[in-house]
């Protein structure tokens, strides 16, 4: 089962130039109803970069600060999810949802 806010290693090979490539951690941002009923999920890459942009959210993960890169969200087939490596914490979840709301609400 895949849940919103799970972090998976995601096979991102064949991504367009300039986007995150290879196998990278990604946060599932699609709602659980979608995750249960379709063969795709929406993910946002998780990176160790310290670059701060309005479309990125800092989270604590694997004993360090990571950035959820919401300006590179993408839909991927579930068979691209290689392995679950954790999930982001409660306070970070609200930050991600708030930022997504700002990006798409108006």
Where are these regions (language model features)?
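Conserved functional hotspots at enzyme active or ligand-binding sites that engage polyanionic ligands
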Residues: 1-106
């Amino acid at each position: 089962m895949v849940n919103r806010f799970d972090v998976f290693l995601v096979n991102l090979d064949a991504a367009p130039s300039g986007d995150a490539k290879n196998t990278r951690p990604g946060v599932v941002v699609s709602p659980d109803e979608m995750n249960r009923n379709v063969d795709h999920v929406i993910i946002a890459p998780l990176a160790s970069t310290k670059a701060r942009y309005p479309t990125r959210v800092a989270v604590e993960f694997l004993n360090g600060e990571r950035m959820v890169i919401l300006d590179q969200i993408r839909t991927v087939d579930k068979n691209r999810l290689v392995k679950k490596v954790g999930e982001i914490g409660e306070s970070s979840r609200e930050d991600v949802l708030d930022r997504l709301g700002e990006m798409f609400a108006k």
